[in-house]
UniProtKB/Swiss-Prot annotation:
Protein name as it appears in the record: Receptor-binding cancer antigen expressed on SiSo cells
Residue spans, topological domain Cytoplasmic: 28-213
Coiled coil: 163-211
Lineage, broadest ranks: Eukaryota, Metazoa, Chordata, Craniata, Vertebrata
Matching InterPro entries: Cancer-assoc_antigen_RCAS1 (IPR017025)
Transmembrane segments: 7-27
Biased composition (Basic and acidic residues): 179-206
Stored PANTHER family: RECEPTOR-BINDING CANCER ANTIGEN EXPRESSED ON SISO CELLS, RECEPTOR-BINDING CANCER ANTIGEN EXPRESSED ON SISO CELLS CANCER ASSOCIATED SURFACE ANTIGEN RCAS1 ESTROGEN RECEPTOR-BINDING FRAGMENT- ASSOCIATED GENE 9 PROTEIN
Disordered, as annotated region: 179-213
Subcellular location as annotated: Golgi apparatus membrane
Superkingdom as given in the UniProt entry: Eukaryota
Amino acid sequence: MAITQFRLFKVCTCLATVFSFLKRLICRSGRGRKLSGDQITLPTTVDYSSVPKQTDVEEWTSWDEDAPTSVKIEGGNGNVATQQNALEQLEPDYFKDMTPTIRKTQKIIIKKREPLNFGIPDGSTGFSSRLAATQDMPFIHQSPELGDLDTWQENTNAWEEEEDAAWQAEEVLRQQKIADREKRAAEQQRKRMEKEAQRLMRKEQNKIGVKLS
């Protein structure tokens, strides 16, 4: 029983392989036909009649041949002059705001006033006479921009005094620096001499110790 089943299985496998081989052959033949039928041949020729024709290129020297060669102005020179004058009048004056305005300096005059006695007879002690104005004194209002130039008094010795003060200050600083430098040099010299004396003293003490030993 087992042998018959094995033989049947072997026969079935052989038939299956044969059918699969045939199926592959049929598929390959159908695919080859389809590819051969789908091939399309493209034309290799070019039709120059469909290309648009270019316009003729003109030379640049012939561009202004049709342009006018002269311009005629009608009306005469008088109309042109009036038009120019009208244009000049219409132009705005840009420098109008920059014109300086000159203002006259305002003067205030203080009138003389009589001193107030408050019932005190003349000659008695009253208010001081310095409170009463003796004469009319003109008061000149100074402008905020320039001020009163008449009250300026130039002091020619101010610059010389400042230069002398600066020179004296520099001289004092220089002398102080020299004194500090000399003081430091003397201090260093003193320390050097003390060290030298201590070294000689140790040397003498060592000699005395060697002799005693």
